[in-house]
Amino acid sequence: MAMAFPLSYTPTITVKPVTYSRRSNFVVFSSSSNGRDPLEENSVPNGVKSLEKLQEEKRRAELSARIASGAFTVRKSSFPSTVKNGLSKIGIPSNVLDFMFDWTGSDQDYPKVPEAKGSIQAVRNEAFFIPLYELFLTYGGIFRLTFGPKSFLIVSDPSIAKHILKDNAKAYSKGILAEILDFVMGKGLIPADGEIWRRRRRAIVPALHQKYVAAMISLFGEASDRLCQKLDAAALKGEEVEMESLFSRLTLDIIGKAVFNYDFDSLTNDTGVIEAVYTVLREAEDRSVSPIPVWDIPIWKDISPRQRKVATSLKLINDTLDDLIATCKRMVEEEELQFHEEYMNERDPSILHFLLASGDDVSSKQLRDDLMTMLIAGHETSAAVLTWTFYLLTTEPSVVAKLQEEVDSVIGDRFPTIQDMKKLKYTTRVMNESLRLYPQPPVLIRRSIDNDILGEYPIKRGEDIFISVWNLHRSPLHWDDAEKFNPERWPLDGPNPNETNQNFSYLPFGGGPRKCIGDMFASFENVVAIAMLIRRFNFQIAPGAPPVKMTTGATIHTTEGLKLTVTKRTKPLDIPSVPILPMDTSRDEVSSALS
């Protein structure tokens, strides 16, 4: 997971006014899969649509003309060459000079990234990744977003994304992301860079071995079954349910047991630790979209009731994690340990137990950072995936019918197993397509730590870069019917879509060396939950429920929840066919025919 980014300024574009969300300043109507109100779109006269299309074509033509005329071309000064020659004459080695001046190239012209300028008010009424899509359609796969002295590079080109995330990943850090998350994740795997990241990745990745993932399938099934019990009660009473909060509690219960063997039991209880976790989660999300980092003001931490609550919540969580680490250490010391590649303690198969049993020599503070990182990353993203998957399913009954047919055939009335994961192909494609339309997160953040060339554009170190996964996943250049929810766009007998076989136009879990290490864990978690809920219930948008709208946070949330009605499925009875026999058939012949 990566968090959405803070905004200090934003570009000037035309947007319609919408109602502000209490969760965030960045909101967009999302009653359809493309984040717009379909009723509003359908009400626009064809003549107006044609006019808008003509205006858009005119803007793009003007941009092409400006590029052709050299408006985005910078003529390089001969000054760097003069300096380089002078330094050479006084004995500076040529390899040092080449390194110092390589990014500046020769005295030839070089292209300048197209630039969009503006003010913060222009897009405060929309989730930020929506205006980025509109700008992408105008400016192309890479452009600079400039406001005052600050600028960002927006990347929506798969080849450039691949270069940043994979081919030259060593030249990029997490940048702003690490600064935002330091208060809660410290030097955990997601915000960490350099040698700390390499060491922690080497320690944690082996914990996610095949035996562990297979054991987690049972955990996913048990937790999903507890959610089904709550839905059974709601269906019996005819009550509507708010699924986003339930999915959040489901994934919190799963990640607590999977990572550090702690039973939050949040589907049935509310405790101080659960409240503390949600306080910290909301703070992390709010910081990711706040235009002013007031939390960095020393006195603010003391006078702000909210910041005092965050500090208290963090202390409670850290104390709880310290207790869990101490308990697990005692358990490891007492067991007759024969550690091996797929080691797993049957009583406590958690990642924490694996790390301690492996002899991972780190401080309790580093362990806490790792556990907190996995808690946040593994909780919010999966909850968001399930929320938008079930929203999409309410819009396509034909997809639900195919989904139920597969689930009935593969798992029937039992819990799924690791062997079923390969058989639930259509269920997996539903999840794949949900992640395409609603990527979690919608933007990946990087900062250049070396000079580089993106496409044809030279960039300097220190550039903040936003890779728009939303744009990549909805680009009409790479997807047919890009806005349509169509799980069958990938053949069921083909490979599971990922960044490699989709040429980085599809980044559900990022890509390159910093790709999410829990991609298989998260995929199976989502598939199990979808299968178990769909086999038992039918879901529809609740009568009178507010339109589903998006808001920006660490992931894509709804503004007012996903309110659905739940009804228990009634499967057709499987009545065996009875052969028609003559009236004078004997009893023995009847028994033989029915046996």
From Swiss-Prot:
Residues 1-28 form a transit peptide. Heme binds at residue 516. The keyword Zinc does not apply. InterPro entries: Cyt_P450 (IPR001128), Cyt_P450_CS (IPR017972), Cyt_P450_E_grp-I (IPR002401), Cyt_P450_sf (IPR036396), Cytochrome_P450_Monoox (IPR050196). Changing residue 283 to K: In lut5-2; decreased activity. Disruption phenotype: Accumulation of alpha-carotene and alpha-cryptoxanthin. Triple mutant cyp97a3, bch1 and bch2 has a highly retarded growth. One of its GO terms (molecular function) is beta-carotene 3-hydroxylase activity. PROSITE patterns: CYTOCHROME_P450. It is an enzyme of class 1 (oxidoreductase). GO terms for cellular component: chloroplast; chloroplast envelope. It is found in: Plastid, Chloroplast. One of its GO terms (biological process) is xanthophyll biosynthetic process. Its main location: plastid. Keywords: Carotenoid biosynthesis, Chloroplast, Heme, Iron, Metal-binding, Monooxygenase, Oxidoreductase, Plastid, Transit peptide. Its cofactor is heme. Its EC number is 1.14.-.-. The keyword Oxidoreductase applies. Alpha-carotene is incorporated into photosystems in lut5 mutants. Heme-containing cytochrome P450 involved in the biosynthesis of xanthophylls. Specific for beta-ring hydroxylation of alpha- and beta-carotene. Also has a low activity toward the epsilon-rings of alpha-carotene. The beta-ring of alpha-carotene is the preferred substrate in planta. Belongs to the cytochrome P450 family. This is Protein LUTEIN DEFICIENT 5, chloroplastic. It comes from Arabidopsis thaliana.
